[in-house]
Each structure stands twice: as structure tokens, then as C-alpha cells.
UniProtKB/Swiss-Prot annotation:
Protein function: Binds together with bS18 to 16S ribosomal RNA.
Domain of life: Bacteria
Keyword rRNA-binding assigned: yes
Matching Gene3D superfamilies: 3.30.70.60
Designated name of the protein: Small ribosomal subunit protein bS6
Keyword Calcium: no
Species assigned in the record: Bacillus cytotoxicus (strain DSM 22905 / CIP 110041 / 391-98 / NVH 391-98)
SUPFAM superfamilies (UniProt xref): Ribosomal protein S6
Gene Ontology annotations of biological process type: translation
Gene Ontology terms, MF aspect: small ribosomal subunit rRNA binding; structural constituent of ribosome
Length: 95
């Protein structure tokens, strides 16, 4: 298993409960596919460097995970489809 850092930005206009459900759903996508979540950081609502889909702010989440590539690919696929995640990036950490 390799270490990855995943950062994603959620729409700022979501209700708090829906936001928590989204975070939990995407954490479950990783764990159900064999990943182990090491650390989760909520950066909270921050201003974006530039507008994305007419939004100026976003709710930032950062995950550090030990994972196989399949779990990360599934997360990436679902994050691209989901309209509540406005941006995401997956970085493989150096060993």
C-alpha cells in the first residue's frame, strides 16, 4: 500500500449536515475499497484563488491515506461525477 494525500473542495452553500454526509460518504468509498485513513483535516471555509463555477469560497478537506491504487481511482472517479465537490487532487507521497 502507498501513501496518498487527497485534498478536495466542497461547495460552500451546502447545509452542514449534507456536508458531513458527503465527507463520510467519500471516506467510506476509500475504506470500503481497502484504504486506511490515517489523518483527516478540516480546513474549513476559505476563499478560492479564483472563481470556480461562480463560487468564490469553498470548504476544504484534506485526507492522508494508506491505499491501493484501485481505491484512489474509485475516489477520483466519484469526485469527478459529484457536483458538490468543485475541485479535488490526489498526490502520491514519497516513501
Amino acid at each position: 500500500m502507498k501513501k496518498y494525500e487527497i485534498m478536495y473542495i466542497i461547495r460552500p452553500n451546502m447545509e452542514e449536515e449534507a456536508q458531513k454526509a458527503l465527507v463520510e460518504r467519500f471516506a467510506n468509498v476509500l475504506t470500503n475499497n481497502g484504504a486506511e485513513i490515517i489523518n483527516t483535516k478540516e480546513w474549513g471555509k476559505r476563499r478560492l484563488a479564483y472563481e470556480i463555477n461562480d463560487l468564490r469560497d469553498g470548504f476544504y478537506m484534506i485526507l492522508n491515506v494508506n491505499s491501493n491504487p484501485e481505491a484512489v481511482k474509485e475516489f477520483d472517479r466519484l469526485a469527478k461525477i459529484n457536483e458538490d465537490i468543485i475541485r479535488h487532487i490526489v498526490v502520491k507521497e514519497e516513501e
